[in-house]
Regions:
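Catalytic P-loop NTP-binding/switch module of NTPases
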Residues: 61-69
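Active-site glycine-centered loops adjacent to acidic/histidine catalytic or metal-binding residues
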Residues: 49, 115, 138
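Canonical P-loop GTPase G-domain recognition
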Residues: 118-162
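Conserved small/polar residues in nucleotide/adenosyl-binding loops
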Residues: 183-184
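Short, surface-exposed ligand-recognition loops at beta-strand->loop->(often short) alpha-helix junctions
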Residues: 166-171
Length: 185
């Protein structure tokens, strides 16, 4: 998740070879896109690219955008992508957290990725006080991606819950759906 043009689609493409449209324009992403990401420890996770946040959205669009952001309710971790060279970065971060709170997912673990380090140079490391972890990355060049994947795997392992579930025979299709999502790429 993150503000518009922060690099969310570029990150999804870098991590999963998703091939989603990644352009520097408003509303390049209009629908959530989910892909399988294989972590270094061989775990597989589902990664979803969402529509970008924007302040002062016209009221007739607010509900439509919130419906696409509902994906966050099903997430184990929120990956917050921030444009680290945007002059209004602090307000953008605040807008994202306001929306997460409105969606009632503000209590989920957050990894904040300060993206576009290839453009930021040697700027000091920034910290997101609400995030479980903050790091600098470049979705374009791959800088910091390995460290991010290690941290993501670590946080997922810390929060892993094992569930044994019995399904009725007529609901067996759900098991196949879950397997397809997790084991195909």
């Amino acid at each position: 998740m993150g503000y518009t043009n922060a690099g969310k689609s570029t990150l999804l493409n870098k991590l999963t070879n998703a091939g989603v449209l990644s352009e520097d324009k408003l509303f390049a992403t209009l629908d959530p896109t989910t892909r399988v990401l294989k972590l270094p420890n061989t775990d597989k996770v589902l990664l979803t690219d969402t529509v970008g946040f924007i302040r002062k959205l016209p009221h007739n669009l607010i509900e439509a955008f919130k419906s696409t952001l509902e994906e966050a309710k099903y997430a184990d971790i929120i990956i917050h992508v921030v444009d680290s060279v945007h002059p209004d970065m602090d307000r953008q971060i605040a807008a994202v957290y306001e929306t997460l709170d409105e969606l009632q997912v503000g209590d989920k673990p957050v990894i904040t990725l300060f993206n576009k380090t290839d453009l930021a140079g040697n700027a000091e490391t920034i910290k997101d006080m609400r995030a479980k972890c903050s790091m600098r990355v470049s979705a374009k060049t791959g800088e910091g991606i390995d460290e991010f994947l290690d941290e993501l795997g670590k946080i997922l392992r810390e929060n892993r819950i094992h569930i044994n579930r019995c399904f009725k025979y007529q609901d067996a299709g759900r098991i196949q759906l879950i397997r397809c999502l997790l084991y195909t790429s």
